[in-house]
Amino acid sequence: MDNTSSVPWASAASVTCLSLDAKCHSSSAKSAASSISASPETQAMRHIAHTQRCLSRLTSLVALLLIVLPMTFSPAHSCGPGRGLGRHRARNLYPLVLKQTIPNLSEYTNSASGPLEGVIRRDSPKFKDLVPNYNRDILFRDEEGTGADRLMSKRCREKLNLLAYSVMNEWPGIRLLVTESWDEDYHHGQESLHYEGRAVTIATSDRDQSKYGMLARLAVEAGFDWVSYVSRRHIYCSVKSDSSISSHVHGCFTPESTALLENGVRKPLGELSIGDRVLSMTANGQAVYSEVILFMDRNLEQMQNFVQLHTDGEAVLTVTPAHLVSVWQAESQKLTFVFADRVEEKNQVLVRDVETGELRPQRVVKVGSVRSKGVVAPLTREGTIVVNSVAASCYAVINSQSLAHWGLAPMRLLSTLEAWLPAKEQLHSSPKVVTTAEQQNGIHWYANALYKVKDYVLPQSWRHD
């Protein structure tokens, strides 16, 4: 049976393609007829304009198909673990037990909520960074009567709102209760994230303690960075600081880190341009040169926390914690990708061999951290890049290199289509040269859009939360 016969949009797409093709051929015929008496310059200009019109129509069609195509799949047709497209799969959630914390680490480690950054008072410059939460699905006890319990960091508000939605789904008629958020009265220990608006103490509106284990699990699923079922009376949750969010959300390198160009020259990432061909890595660990097609993030002024991986061959990779790094599994002889802040000493990463130019495993001998200025996240067509001789992914946040690479497929397709278009310089007498200073500053719109939807389509176990 023909697949297009059972999928209405496929037939429509076929008709559209034929229509576009007919229009292009029709316009080509008209152009050919009128170009008999036209000068060579006029004919060239008409040809360029005609090509651009056809490719513009093709680009619109491809964009439409990219939007409609995923909607035609059901969960039964999706591959791999996790949630499929369409309705979410039902997953078994297990409640936390009393005294359990997730992750099972100190709250102030980088893999949890991160270090303290200082108490925020009403007269502190950072007080303006706290935001009120007026979600009607959340009850705030507000014992002080000052509205302080509604104030929190942006990340804390985001996760709390997600949790409130989960609570209503889990227990219809029950709402999330916040008993403490930002604290200005020093009711907690000397080292508490309540003073920074990064922690909340929560319960359910019916105060049913039998629900608290599952409430803690829902908080983990909502993306809180540290959850503790420390007391029978409430659940404690905290998040990373907003200032470290971009390092956590978008994987980046330092601008001073270098990439190897195809001509053999090493170039700082802060000076890379779209179109540069840099050393990358194939899916099976082979060295290959790949084109830079965009920057997912680029900000040369932003201060950021980085993880530093030192190898026994004296290579040093400086990268944000949520970035994926290639790790060689010697026992299984397989290449995997691991979040940078979860790489451990004695793990092996792939490093370029100076003599052969091939990528070889080197042992990590030290894992450190550093705070530095500037972030750069180039995306190559291959989805990988060798930085400071160490092979790394171009992706972050999601612990699947293949899924992340699939998610950026529209950008690779768009880059290919743009390459087919006649150069704009053909329409102008003097081409414009784009300097480094004129390049993108900030997060790419498509990467930012993917980040915003990830919490709604991916399980927490797939995310660096």
UniProtKB/Swiss-Prot annotation:
Broad EC category: hydrolase
Lipid-bearing positions (Cholesterol glycine ester): 251
Annotated binding of Ca(2+) 1, by residue: 143-144, 149, 179-180
Record-level Gene Ontology MF annotations: calcium ion binding; cholesterol-protein transferase activity; morphogen activity; patched binding; peptidase activity
Protein origin, superkingdom: Eukaryota
Gene3D superfamilies, A to Z: 3.30.1380.10, Hedgehog/Intein (Hint) domain
Gene Ontology terms: cellular component: endocytic vesicle; endosome; extracellular space; nucleus; plasma membrane
Entry similarity comment: Belongs to the hedgehog family.
Name this polypeptide is given: Protein hedgehog
Biological source species: Drosophila erecta (Fruit fly)
High-level lineage: Eukaryota, Metazoa, Ecdysozoa, Arthropoda, Hexapoda
